[in-house]
Each structure stands twice: as structure tokens, then as C-alpha cells.
Amino acid sequence: MDDAELIPKDCMSNLSVDSLIFAMDEGRLKILLVKYNQGLAAGKWGLIGHWVKWDEDIESAAYRVVNTTTGVKDFHLDQLSAFGNVNRYPIRRIVTVAYYALVRLEETQIIRGENTHEIQWFDVRNLPELIFDHKDIIESCLEHFKYKVRHEPIGFSLLPEKFTLLQLQELYEAMLEVTLDKPNFRRKINKMNLLIDCKEKQKGVAHRAASLYRFDINVYEKLREFGFSFEY
């Protein structure tokens, strides 16, 4: 049975957005997924998406999905690609435009939508079975990250305002799917002149407290504009 009756009247019936919402949690890259409770996807896990409204830009639709799901207003949002395989949806032709959002886990206040049975963070390396082509979309995004993080400082949007060098290294390792040599990594990061020592230490940790750093916003913006090359 088609689920066209579930589409709001103010939305297009053949164009959707899927928002891949990522966060770092204890050194692991995680993605927010939803188990739907209606339509063809009922009882199954998938990306968080919605139909595009007739009077809405596609990027605005993607932002709306992230904002209404996480409560976060300011986050990194970028278009991944359009996915329009003729058989991606079993009943009728639907094209989706995928965006990825990078959020800080501690800033999120997860809000369950109307067509939501359950919503949960998953490690990107341990995903449940997903609806339609959503696994392919996620895999495409993870491959995209491997290039993007080496040439733009996009991943930094996942870190807290003040962070340790270990947290920064864990971020790169998670997005590149590699284990990095600690001294070599720190040497490369220092050459970028991107970090400012906060002259503070971690608090409330069982292990030896590490120094905290923050990004130099001026250098950060230049790197976003002109890019860089991080080879490992």
C-alpha cells in the first residue's frame, strides 16, 4: 500500500531530503537514525528525512529536519548528493537530496517526530538494517568524509569549544577510519597554527588531566576558504 496519504498537503510528493546527522561520542563517530511507525518504512530504521515543501528551498528543508529533530540551531550543513535510482522507492518515483549535518552531542535535545517510533544514535560502524537505499547513502557520505576532512576543517564542528589533542586525533581517526601515530599527528596539527592553548586542564577526569585547546577562528575561516592538505 502506498503511503502518499501521509504526505502533508503543503509538500511535494516526489522530492524529499534525508539529513545525515553526525556527532562524536567518546571517540566514536555516530549517526542519528529513526525507526518509523507509519507507511512502507514502519518498524524499520532509516535516515531522518522529510518531504520538501512547495515554498521551501531544498537546503532549508534539510535544515528544518535537523533543527526540529535535535533542537540545535547553529551547525555545519552541507549537501552530499542527490539519489534518484529509479528503483530506490518500491512503489513510485521519488528523488531524495541528502545533506550531512555535524553537531555537538552535548548541544542536542532529541525530539521525536510524528512518524517516529524510536530515535537513537548508532556507531557508524555498527548500523542496523536500513530501509531503501539509506545504507548506500551513509556509505557514500563516509567516503566523502575521508577526502573532505583532509582538505577542509569540517570535522571541527563536531568538537566541543574546548577540547584535548586526543579528542582531535580521535575525530580524525573516526572520519578517516585509520589509526594515526600520535607524535606525527600532533606535529602536523601544530604546523597548521590552528590551535590556541587555553592554559586550562580537563576537570573531573580519573586519568591525568590533559591540556585544553580551542580553534583560532581567523585561521579556521582561512582554512575553510582556501583549504589545506592533511596527509597521514
Model-predicted regions and their roles:
Residues 100, 110-144, 158-166, 184-193, ...:
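NUDIX/MutT-family hydrolases
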Residues 175-189, 198-201:
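Short conserved catalytic/interaction loops centered on acidic-Pro-aromatic/His motifs
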Residues 200-232:
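Long, intrinsically disordered, low-complexity Ser/Thr/Pro-rich regulatory/activation regions
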Residues 146-176:
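Polybasic "coupling" helices that flank or enter modular domains
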Residues 7-45:
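N-terminal strand-loop-strand
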